[in-house]
Amino acid sequence: MERVRKNFATADNVLEPPHLISMQRISYEEFLQIDRAPEEREDVGLQAILKNIFPINDFNGLCSLEFLKYKFGEPKYTVQECQQRGMSYEIPLKIVVRLITFDVDEETGVQTIRDMKEQEVFLGSLPLMTADGVFVVNGTERVIVSQLQRSPGLFYSHDNGKSHSSGKLLYSARIIPVRGSWIDLEFDIKDVLHVRIDRRRKFPVTTLLKALGYSSEELLREFYPLENVKLSDGKYWVRFVAEHTAGQRLEFDLVNPQDGEILAKKGRKISKALCRKAVEAGIEFIEASSETILGKVLASAITLAGAEEPLYPCNTEITETVLENLAENGINEFETLFMDGVNYSASFSHTLRLDKVITTAEALLEIYRRLRPSSPPTLEIATTFFENLFFNPDLYDLSEVGRYKINAKLGLKTDIEHRALTRDDIIYGVRYLVRLKDNQGGIDDIDHLGNRRVRTVGELVENQYRMGLVRMERAIKERMTLQDVETLMPHDLINPKPISAAIKEFFGTSQLSQFMDQTNALSEVTHKRRLSALGPGGLSRERAGFEVRDVHPTHYGRICPIETPEGPNIGLIVSLATYARVNPYGFIETPYRKVENRVILDDIRYLSALEEQKQIIAPALVALEADHQSISEGNLIAREEGDVITIGSDNVTYMDVAPNQMISVAASLVPFLENDDANRALMGSNMQRQAVPLLVTAAPLVGTGMERYVARDSGACLLSAGDGVVEEVDSNRVVVRYDKPGVDGYDTGVAVYRLTKYKKSNQNTCFTQTPTILPGLKVEKGTLLADGPGCEAGELALGKNLTVAFMPWRGFNYEDSILINERLLKEDAYTSIHIDVFETMARDTKLGKEEITRDIPNVSEDTLRNLDDSGIVRVGAEIKPGDTLVGKVTPKGETVLSPEEKLLRAIFGEKAQDVKDSSLRVPPGVTGVVIDAKVFSRKGVDKDERSLMIEDLEIERLEGDKRDELRSLKNGVCRELGELIAGNTALGDILDSKGELLISSGDKIEVVHAIAIGFHRLKDIDFSGMADCTDRMDAAYERYQKQAEVIAQRYDGIIERQKKGDDLPPGVVKMVKVYVATKRKLSVGDKMAGRHGNKGVVSRILPEEDMPYFANGDTVDIVLNPLGVPSRMNVGQILEVHLGFAAKNLGAQLEKLAEQYAVEEIKAKLSRVYSDSEYHAIIDGKTDAEVIDWAYRHRKGLHMATPVFDGAEEAEIRKLLIESGVDKGGQSQLYDGLTGEPFANLVTVGVMYMLKLHHLVDNKIHARSTGPYSLVTQQPLGGKAQFGGQRLGEMEVWAMEAYGAAYTLKEFLTVKSDDVEGRTTMYERIVKGNNFLTTGLPESFHVLVKELQGLCLNMELIEE
């Protein structure tokens, strides 16, 4: 039964958190489309790439290879087999292709089909994702982390005035495709607009526009409005356009042409009102001075009648000479460009003037020269090159996201499927940039989540697969030309190696393919929900600035502002918020409830950062009316465009779905997070991921209600796949018979769940499952069947609930040190199991095969005491450093034999051949018990006794599972048939399976009789008198036969694989893996932490009698330093301690009441503590005995849930403290265990959830007496891994000098370090008892001399 927690939440639970790893699973499912029929597959993922690359045509157009469909085979091994054998869990991919050959008529050039060949071709294997969202690669579980990347599209920015000393803003734009050339547009300090393609040399943007087919005149008309100027009676008149004229001053009086009235005097500023008057008066032109006309620019070329060349080309600046020439030639009307220096500057006109290119052909050639300087172009080559650069969908891809972004930015209506650039994209993009420079529009914020998208697993693998396919395409084209196509079949052309190599490289070595963090269930879930800005195509740590790393307003509800690593990756690796999801375009969406006129609708919508911009969003904890259906009247605090504003509730359009919507899963596991400083909250949420699963788990008394979701979705716990009945339970497996067949993925209706026992995780912690269900119980979909590591009752349980006192204790909790009660060690409270795996391989060497054997030369029998006859350590053996785990001998090189040895060889045969001991031994620092040994032998090699024994045990286990599954199936059919015949009268005597009388003739048949009769005898009984019965029985039998066959085939396949040899790496004959479990108790030096960033190291484990104790004699478990709280500002831990104290004492009260069998008092107590719904969930349907049992099971404390941002108030905690019978201030009188005296002040005491972290002192501490030396310097190596020594550095030398210990120092620096001769002499002298020190020269001095000689400086030692 699911645990009921006392929940302090006030907000309605409108939306359950989604499945926490659905992002990974959905993405990869969409990539493979494995469950869809070929004809139903959409053009995404694998289908899209294959359709994109195929058809592949040869260079002469004589043959074509077309893609028809793809299909998948069955995985060769199960996930568990892959992990044991070090294989990859993958699925074979086959494609059906058609090879068409053509005949070409040489005269007409018409193609006719000569031949068509269709064939299914193997295209390599693809890694398959497990149900938990991980990939098994070479036996290890890996996660593909999603990447946060700048979205493709069009972006505008400026340099913040940093490029030039004047501080002038230089604007730029960039068009980023997914595949293809980048376009950069940028203004220089002189306001000339340049373009760069792929960051090459820049050239004027007008060259690019002319290459698109625009003439200079068309370009000017695109960028500027036109003004009409005419000359009459020696005066210049400019056409009146209200928008252009507003804000200017009149040079002459403005006269109404109809009645001559002066509407405005000269010198007056033209207002909007005056513009309206002028329009009403029908004024078409206003008078302008010649000075005004000077400096304007001609919009079109002016050509005299009959002349070929224009008098003045367009874009000519008007000077006095130009005006005189125009008047002389009788040109009284012309068009100019409107430039006011505010909304329309001269920059584009100026750029066009600097551009020497005139025609489209010249522009194309110029661009070709810039990008391909070496080869001389022809117009045809240049045109094709330019078309391929941006407009060929095969070579340039904006992706749907890029197209969507460009359409949104420029207001275009281009079809979303059109993924190459268009002329409009470029011209409107340039126009937007010119307007931007003229202060119209705004730049893009690159850290806005509307401009950053997530590339999930599916997309990352898709990109990799495309690279492999492109390589394969090249190879296919070459083969088509080199070989005779008529005789070829498709499989002769297709070689899947480039694809397999690309996929292997990605999964094995990519920065985004990571070794899964498997320390506990939470670290698994968090790793799968992680987003990284690093990796190929992303940022690098060195170049990422502060802005990219910082929290952005659009992160709200999408990316957690708290959970990110400390150190160089801060802000670059982040976590998805609890309710967030990724939409098909890769943008992160978060759910909101729709609000209209203050009424909250049932409609929940997911909005991306861009869609959210125009909305006004209220928080989840906003004041509601009594019916909880609408928001209260008045002002409230809401969010709009990233700002927090106060606004009337009538204006709200959406509201949050949950208070913890903005934070990640790990952060939402911290109770009272709202009372912690952000830095400590970050540490708290990060350190939970490092907690080691303990031997005995306990869920936190003070939780947040999120614990069960993490346990449910991590895959650590075993859940029921559907409704059914538990048939059988033991410590190794659970058998469930489901009501409907097909629930468990097989069409049998029976599932044997084999629990994972003592499996090594990636971080060497122990992964083991414990059943929590009883046989005969009914289960529903999602019912907990077994708890995983670090879980209890289906909830995450990473630590222990400890009674904590905040007080100094004789300096042992100085600087965050922790004082621990020895009782915790006796109770194994913080004991964890860690599993190491050691493996060795017997290889086939040049000198002969290595052999795994117990027969090892020159080794005592005592050393081999734990090995069996095959030379492999027995399971259950206790081992310590240096013990032999697997005996192995390697042949030595052939030596020249003496006559005596030849004689021995002749007498004793090969046995006397030289072999050396290369056994696998336990490394330093490892002690424990051998829990398993696995032997893998190459196919065709005889298996040893141990291999056969392991194989027999495994086959026996599988046969047992098969029997149980068939028995459950039979019982199910018997029950079904029993229900069918129940109530009918027996036509004759019916015997049971043992042959004894069960039902006499004429008696009524009941359901239970069917099982007693037995499955096989049921069908021999005459049921002819019952209508429809025989047919239905036959159908049931037929179904049983089919289902039994499915079960038999499945198990037989696994058993067959067990009997076969194993696939081992080349040259390996046999491989042995030995698993050693180590029990780690809590010890001094271990790191512990709470959930609020309060971490420390165990400084002393104090005997129970010396610990501070309460008046009733109970001792506290742990003593923490009170000074660790105020400066860290993580007050959440104090609130947790108080609430935990209330929870614990309520449990103690329930225990007393249970002992007194006071059922009514228990119910009264529970009704005061819990809400009505929680109370009924606990009490309803329970007998008095069950209520007592419930109370007794909760004797250690009642479980509370205080959700983040919606948790327990101070008054509620006080109320519970009073209810639990302790001081409402949460302080108690403690007594000193050493003296028995009471402490002077009251002490804050309570219950805190403390974790043991993965930084265990046993893994870090290390000492050496003798060991390996460095070859060059002859000094001991450094570090635990190398079994190195302790470094005696320069500071230590100074210390020795300060004490004047010259001889000791000399000994340190010579014979104890790298004086080779001195070392040997010293050893001899100690052996002979002549302890007198003589030293030589340290080896490092010789190294220094050699180094100097390398610099051509000869140095000789003069010994006198």
Swiss-Prot record:
Enzyme class at the top of the EC tree: transferase
Gene Ontology cellular-component terms listed: DNA-directed RNA polymerase complex
GO BP annotations listed: DNA-templated transcription
Source domain of life: Bacteria
EC number: 2.7.7.6
CDD domains: RNA_pol_B_RPB2
GO molecular function: DNA binding; DNA-directed RNA polymerase activity; ribonucleoside binding
SUPFAM superfamilies (alphabetical): beta and beta-prime subunits of DNA dependent RNA-polymerase
Keyword Nucleotidyltransferase: yes
Oxidoreductase in keyword set: no
Keyword terms: DNA-directed RNA polymerase, Nucleotidyltransferase, Transcription, Transferase
A Pfam family of this chain: RNA_pol_Rpb2_2
Subunit-structure text: The RNAP catalytic core consists of 2 alpha, 1 beta, 1 beta' and 1 omega subunit. When a sigma factor is associated with the core the holoenzyme is formed, which can initiate transcription.
Protein purpose: DNA-dependent RNA polymerase catalyzes the transcription of DNA into RNA using the four ribonucleoside triphosphates as substrates.
Sequence similarity: Belongs to the RNA polymerase beta chain family.
Listed name of the protein: DNA-directed RNA polymerase subunit beta
Gene: rpoB
